[in-house]
């Protein structure tokens, strides 16, 4: 009951905040449609955050730095993902797929929110398959090298307002596999990514 009451108060506060603006800018038509459901009295525009594609054109030097740091051989098949380690991002699905493919290396770049990890995430972190590496938060040349070296960027998130890491992976010319969720409709299709309808969870 408390959580329902809090959610109602939070929504009222959001509506007040949004209506205090002159205009509202949100990154995708999907997130725009969510805001429109709040019955706001302001103009709402969908404008992507975008990424600087020149920054996501991995060089051989960046790829070599990444492979050397994490001991990735030329023969290794590598699947990566990037984001906070929690269920909404699909971390549990990523772990499950890694467990089912022991011959492939999996890496998830990102930190767990230690202040409030769910019991499910705590359990997953204690029982990780041996082929799954969690480097934590990584930036700069190393993450760019990861985007360049990986065979697949697998991002099974259940909900996004855009998905900046998806833009980064696409800019890096990665083979992208996504859970088919509404936010991607209209700008991601089979020409640039695999949209999975049968991802468990």
Locate the predicted segments by residue.
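Nucleotide-activated donor-binding/catalytic signature segment of Leloir-type glycosyltransferases, i.e.
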Residues: 118-141
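Aromatic "clamp/platform" in nucleotide-sugar-dependent glycosyltransferases that forms part
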Residues: 158
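Glycosyltransferase donor-sugar binding loop
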Residues: 51, 82, 105-120, 134
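Carbohydrate-associated surface elements
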Residues: 30, 50
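Membrane-proximal helix-turn-helix segments that form the acceptor-binding/catalytic region
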Residues: 5-23
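Short alpha-helical donor nucleotide-sugar binding micro-motif in glycosyltransferases
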Residues: 18, 137-138, 145-150
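Short hydrophobic beta-strand element within catalytic cores of glycosyltransferases
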Residues: 175-178
